[in-house]
């Protein structure tokens, strides 16, 4: 994803989708708070997202799935009780060594229910952190362990990845059933493609999540054009 082909894909998914996002925002109460931030980001989002892929040797770096959302997880349930027994990640096509923010932000913004997406974000980060430390010890990791604050610093630093998730996996996961859903319609210039993109970013459920997520990203500084 962080090569030339990936750059073109990211641009299509983010910078090119700004007009659709802005049109949708005008229908959401309170959008004035963050509307200009997103408008000013247009043309700069791709480069900011690519910066997330730059490895910082001073931070903890992990092997990310890089497309971590519910559609790429298989679940195994007990046939009688329905109890969840196990889960497996699938589709390892774009794995990336780098910041923990890549998978954490993508998964937590795309695959959680509306009522816990923001309200329980820090809770889930703590659960991740506890499991991380447990397994670093299990694997006899011999470098300095990250603190929970270190993980949060990485999430704040790479907050623009949250906007990537909003345009990409969150939109896909909340898309209402339609026969027009296809990669061609996501990226081509036809009237049918334009209609699909309008549907993708203007769905009722998607807008309910936008109304919660975008102010949250705004308040975290994730939508700032310039880093102070």
Where are the language model's segments positioned?
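Generic recognition of stable, solvent-exposed alpha-helical segments in well-folded globular domains
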Residues: 12, 16, 59, 63, ...
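Acidic, serine/threonine- and proline-rich low-complexity regulatory regions
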Residues: 54-56, 111-116, 135-158
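Active-site activation/catalytic loop segments of kinase-like enzymes and analogous catalytic loops
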Residues: 94-138, 161-185, 191-195
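ATP-dependent phospho-/nucleotidyl transfer catalytic cores
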Residues: 1-65, 76-81, 191-192, 197-228
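Helical subdomain adjoining the active site within ATP-dependent kinase catalytic cores
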Residues: 144-153, 158-228
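Conserved ATP-binding subdomain of kinase catalytic cores across diverse folds
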Residues: 1-15, 19, 96-101, 116, ...
């Amino acid at each position: 994803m962080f090569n030339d082909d990936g750059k073109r894909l990211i641009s299509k998914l983010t910078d090119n989708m700004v007009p659709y996002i802005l049109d949708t925002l005008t229908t959401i109460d309170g959008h004035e708070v963050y509307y200009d931030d997103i408008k000013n980001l247009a043309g700069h989002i791709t480069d900011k997202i690519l910066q997330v892929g730059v490895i910082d040797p001073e931070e903890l770096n992990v092997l990310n799935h890089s497309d971590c959302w519910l559609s790429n997880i298989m679940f195994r349930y007990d046939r009688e009780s329905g109890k969840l027994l196990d889960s497996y990640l699938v589709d390892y096509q774009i794995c990336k060594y780098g910041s923990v923010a890549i998978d954490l932000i993508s998964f937590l913004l795309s695959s959680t229910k509306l009522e816990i997406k923001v309200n329980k974000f820090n809770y889930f980060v703590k659960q991740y952190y506890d499991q991380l430390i447990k397994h670093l010890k299990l694997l006899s990791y011999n470098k300095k362990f990250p603190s929970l604050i270190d993980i949060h610093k990485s999430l704040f630093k790479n907050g623009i990845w949250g906007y990537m998730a909003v345009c990409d996996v969150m939109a896909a996961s909340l898309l209402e059933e339609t026969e027009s859903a296809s990669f061609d319609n996501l990226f081509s210039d036809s009237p049918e493609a334009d209609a699909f993109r309008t549907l993708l970013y203007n769905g009722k459920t998607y807008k309910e999540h936008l109304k919660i997520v975008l102010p949250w990203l705004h308040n975290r500084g994730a939508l700032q054009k310039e880093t102070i």
